[in-house]
């Protein structure tokens, strides 16, 4: 398996000479969550959590994107407010087009010269300057144009999300204790290596007596060619297999055929392209002050960057992600990868399977 990060090399000259202004403070508007908040048909509030294990935060946070022509400024178009009570930076963007997809990223850092170009961890779609160009139009027939102002991976949002009319809103597994599960990797299952190909083989699976399909990880992972155990954006489905609508069509078709859909999910670790890792980084690993990750895994199954599963922030993130997948995609269950890594107790190969209360 892959166990090294696949970083996108970038050279940042676009914002040379920009001097961030003094921090402006204001309380985060009521009922906001971290990430992208749709307020109305023309307004979005972006919320970025930034409070390390020592209670400190970055010295500045701005946002750049299609909505401000990728231009940094110390005003309401780019500079984020700071709310120490919540530990968040935030900004409300007005005058947006409800039907337009906007690309954006955060620009955060310190007075000592640290600058981080950060996508939103909660985005449902990323644009990747290195890998999107290799995805065929037959697999992904929606916008993949990378913005000229971006630096590395960028996130997106759209106020008026594309609707999908589910045929099966309340699918129930007929015999949950008698599942015949087929573990399916979309890349390897058919010649087209995507959802379109898998859709054409559902009758084959049904004829074999399969009543549940377990999709190997489909949340956005580094690159396009992987088993998926190198996740980076947990709320975005990987575009190498298809669009959001195609994923929903596949799940709907499975339900129509009487087959449940189980997602293989990876919450033991994330790659360095994950924004929660990238925000607090040191050399080639997560920094000691990162509130989401361990510097080194306490267990012997270390791959990529190990989540601190006792962190309230991690538990909140995982719970929110699972709820999102259930509601947005109507999946029927989950297979949790590498659960022996869900620990903060130091262990070895011989003790890793011990009960950990």
Which residues are covered by each model-predicted region?
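Surface-exposed loop/turn motifs at beta-strand-loop junctions within extracellular Ig-like
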Residues: 1-2, 108-110, 219
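Exposed beta-strand face motif in extracellular beta-rich ectodomains
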Residues: 1, 100-104
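Aromatic-rich carbohydrate-binding modules that target alpha-glucans
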Residues: 46-99, 109-131
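Substrate-binding/active-site clefts of carbohydrate-active enzymes
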Residues: 127, 141, 163, 167-176, ...
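Non-catalytic, glycine-rich low-complexity segments
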Residues: 3-57, 141
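Core domains of carbohydrate- and sulfate-ester-processing enzymes
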Residues: 104, 108, 112-168, 276-296
């Amino acid at each position: 398996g892959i166990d090294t990060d696949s970083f996108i090399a970038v050279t940042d000259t676009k914002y040379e000479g920009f001097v961030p202004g003094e921090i402006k403070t204001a309380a985060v508007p009521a009922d906001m969550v971290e990430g992208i908040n749709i307020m109305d048909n023309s307004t979005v509030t972006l919320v970025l959590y930034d409070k390390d294990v020592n209670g400190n935060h970055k010295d500045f946070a701005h946002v750049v994107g299609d909505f401000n022509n990728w231009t940094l400024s110390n005003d309401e178009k780019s500079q984020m407010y700071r709310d120490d009570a919540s530990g968040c930076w935030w900004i409300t963007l007005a005058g947006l087009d409800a039907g337009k997809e906007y690309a954006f990223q955060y620009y955060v850092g310190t007075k000592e010269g640290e600058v981080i170009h950060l996508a939103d961890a909660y985005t449902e779609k990323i644009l990747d300057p290195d890998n999107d160009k290799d995805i065929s139009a037959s697999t992904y027939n929606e916008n993949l144009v990378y913005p000229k102002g971006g630096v590395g991976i960028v996130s997106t949002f759209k106020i008026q999300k594309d609707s999908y009319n589910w045929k099966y809103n309340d699918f129930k597994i007929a015999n949950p204790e008698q599942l015949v599960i087929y573990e399916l990797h979309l890349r390897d299952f058919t010649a087209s290596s995507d959802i379109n190909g898998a859709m054409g083989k559902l009758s084959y699976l049904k004829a074999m007596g399969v009543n549940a399909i377990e999709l190997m990880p489909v949340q956005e992972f580094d690159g396009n060619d992987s088993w998926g155990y190198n996740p980076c954006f947990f709320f975005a489905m990987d575009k190498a297999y298809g669009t959001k609508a195609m994923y929903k069509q596949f799940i709907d078709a499975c339900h129509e055929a009487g087959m449940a859909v189980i997602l293989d999910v990876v919450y033991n670790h994330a790659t360095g392209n994950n924004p929660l890792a990238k925000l607090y980084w040191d050399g080639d690993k997560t920094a000691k002050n990162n509130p989401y990750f361990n510097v080194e895994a306490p267990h012997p199954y270390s791959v990529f960057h190990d989540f601190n599963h006792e962190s309230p922030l991690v538990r909140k993130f995982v719970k929110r992600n699972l709820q999102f997948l259930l509601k947005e995609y109507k999946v029927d269950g989950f297979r949790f990868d590498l659960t022996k890594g869900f620990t903060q107790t130091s262990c070895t190969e011989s003790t890793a399977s011990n009960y950990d209360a």
